Amino acid sequence: MAEHRIKDICNSNARSVKGLNKDIEIQYLETSDLTCGECSNLQPILLKNAPSRAQRLLSSDTIVYSMVRPNLCHYGYFENPPQNLVVSTGFLTLNLKPQYIGIIDPHFVYLLLTQPWLTQYLHTIAQNAVSSYPSLNPSDVECLCFEFPDFEIQRRFADLFFKIDRKIALNREINRNLEAMARQLYD
């Protein structure tokens, strides 16, 4: 097993909207609109009308992790996000460095960062922050150190958990549709 710090294997906040045409439409994601990997609201808005915190542009295989109130689990993994997806500066974005592709699985990194014990640990750090609300610094996440098994083991493990997550999401969608159908029948 190899031991790596997040900052050694990932680039943080690598892409921003700086230099983009301000008249383009973006899909904006606020921290409260993402919980445990599930988006509840993407806001289409012109970049020039977006909140000043709409700065972080996503690319493929991006991990987003809220720096505010980590106990609320505002984090997610974006495998193939829309080209114009922008998230709040309240998120830390992490992308695997090119030299670690095929050595570290980004899905596995996401699974490590979203473990309940780690969420609690980061929340404890956030509560001690010198601000009016519990918040983290990017370095609090970047300095985390993990042991990584062989790439194939990481990939299999992450694949299994992501399949389970997709099945859970599908079941939730089916339940929402069934609930809507029941309302139509009884209203």
Predicted regions, residues:
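Short, ligand-facing micro-motifs at secondary-structure edges
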Residues: E30-P44, P70-T89, Y121-T124, S131
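A short beta-sheet element
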Residues: A54-R56, S60-L118
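Short, positively charged
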Residues: I104-D140
